[in-house]
Amino acid sequence: MARVADYSIIADGWVVEASQDTISFEVPSTIDAGSRSVLGFMLQVNNLDDTNMTLRLNGQKVWTWQYSEGKRIMFFQEVIGAGILKPGTNVFSFDSSSGDFRFVQLSDIVVWWQANV
């Protein structure tokens, strides 16, 4: 059976942690669950103290990050282990922690996966 790459858009616009930190999205039944996937996203953070950030897919931690104060907008990609992404409904969630003020939002969240055709 041949394999092709495809993707699912989790969110296109900005998703602010304070108002929405969990997003459900669909993956077709043709996904090859034994293959790794790639998660890509824009991250904007404005913080006054060290901030820790965690992203999860289906409850499993897939990315963590920490940095000092400042305001930044960056794009990240992360390879996701095999078996984390599943056919049907999947859940993307994120949270952050800091000792002081922080503003965190993500956009253009996309996951690339392999499908059997």
Features from the language model and the residues they span:
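Beta-strand-rich recognition domains
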Residues: M1-V117
